Amino acid sequence: VYVHGKSYEIQPVTTIMSSVNQLVATLQTTRQSLDRSLLRLTALELDDYVTLADITGIFSSFEIMQQAKTELKDCIVKLGNQGKLVQMQLEQLAGSSMDTEYDLMIRDYASDSSEANAEKIRAELARMTPKDLSDPQHVAAVLGYDDLDEDSVMTPLGLRTLSRVSVVRDGVAEKIVDEYGSLQELMDDISEDPERLGDFGVNNPAILADSLYRMKGTKQGNA
């Protein structure tokens, strides 16, 4: 059978559903692990203590999610109308919010943080073998760095972390990052003058400052 110019072998629904169940289980397990890793990463970022090894493991998890997502989409096409529930599960586990977070994390750590370069990096990561994805030096090379080892300290821009704060509207995170250059520079400044964030379009600078300190696990002024 041909759908949108792509050929599909007709398989029994039971066979397809067996694959679906395995893929959904992979997505669930990997997503749980990824969420825990991202929470830990946020804390490390705010403490300025992220290493290349920390982000390598997370990029690997994102790619496991992407691969399972691609395979599950094929199953949904094969299931036709019976694939609606599976589609809902896919959106819940690996929807657009995950793609956005992946893009922002790449931009946070790439030597060139442009959206166009992030797209190229995602394509390169998708082509890498699981072995290469687990190798910090291979990942560093894709991000645009040479001569780094797994213990090398990585300084994020802060796009991903800022995007998690509700008072940071679309486009505001970019302005903040352009001004400060790194999340740590931002943290250093808001400890002295949080209201300055209002200059970049943050309607409630105190809320943003408080949110960042809560993520860090400290109270404002005691960092």
Annotated model-derived regions:
Residues H4-A25:
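Intrinsically disordered, low-complexity, Ser/Thr/Glu/Asp/Lys/Arg-enriched terminal regions and linkers
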Residues V1:
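Conserved catalytic cores of phosphodiester-cleaving nucleases, focusing on short active-site segments
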Residues E9, L23-N222:
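Long, highly charged, low-complexity intrinsically disordered interaction regions
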